[in-house]
From Swiss-Prot:
It comes from the Bacteria. GO terms for molecular function: ADP binding; ATP binding; phosphotransferase activity, phosphate group as acceptor; protein serine/threonine kinase activity. Bifunctional serine/threonine kinase and phosphorylase involved in the regulation of the pyruvate, phosphate dikinase (PPDK) by catalyzing its phosphorylation/dephosphorylation. It is an enzyme of class 2 (transferase). It comes from Geobacillus sp. (strain WCH70). This is Putative pyruvate, phosphate dikinase regulatory protein. Keywords: Kinase, Nucleotide-binding, Serine/threonine-protein kinase, Transferase. It catalyses: N(tele)-phospho-L-histidyl/L-threonyl-[pyruvate, phosphate dikinase] + ADP = N(tele)-phospho-L-histidyl/O-phospho-L-threonyl-[pyruvate, phosphate dikinase] + AMP + H(+); N(tele)-phospho-L-histidyl/O-phospho-L-threonyl-[pyruvate, phosphate dikinase] + phosphate + H(+) = N(tele)-phospho-L-histidyl/L-threonyl-[pyruvate, phosphate dikinase] + diphosphate. Its EC number is 2.7.11.32, 2.7.4.27. The keyword Nucleotide-binding applies. Belongs to the pyruvate, phosphate/water dikinase regulatory protein family. PDRP subfamily. ADP binds at residues 149-156.
Amino acid sequence: MNQRLVYVVSDSGGETAELVVRAAASQFYNSHIQLKRVPYVEDKTMLAEVVALAKMNQAIIAFTLVVPEMRQFLIEEAAREGVVAYDIIGPLIEKMSDLFKLTPRYEPGQVRVLDEDYFKKIEAIEFAVKYDDGRDPRGILRADIVLIGVSRTSKTPLSQYLAHKRLKVANVPIVPEVEPPEQLFKVPPEKCFGLKISPEKLLSIRRERLKSLGLNDQAIYANMDRIKEELAYFDGIVKKIGCDVIDVTNKAVEETANIIMKKRRL
């Protein structure tokens, strides 16, 4: 077999099927399994074409088709052509229907239905992008949470993680040469969190960052005296605000986010 190929077929976007297939493929070390997504399948002609391609390429078909007629056609067509076709969602729908005495809607794309919760998440993500890295201080007073810290303390990834929890987050870099925006000192202290890190850890992170950019890792940005100066300035700012400080030295973003949400009781 020249290639290991899986056609991911769906009558919706195919994200669900692809996630399952990728999870399965991850169990095979250095397998180099290739996925080809075939989304929004609406007719049997397209299904027949996929079966023909799968036969020609000795591939597997993994599919999420919720319409029974389409699902049955693919199963029968694949069997007729000797192609392996795996139904990801059909058997589970049937088991749920039988056990819970429920009637399925058989409507594609229900996972992607745009509801209020979805819009809140999108709004929070857009907010985090717009008010990232102190770009626009007007967002500080509109935010649910404000993060402050020196460079490379995971402010941006933490903002994005919290945004996926539907929280509007603004973050502000603390730099000795730049006076923090006045809005920062008007934020209720309980909404603001300072991100603290050990000088040694920060030095290591910054040097790796410079190397990844192809720059000299001995630049002032990765100088211990400079780092200590920045952290001392940061300490003064958080004391002035009166906000909580979280040591992120050895914490994953998820762990820091959980601490913040617990403190805010979110």
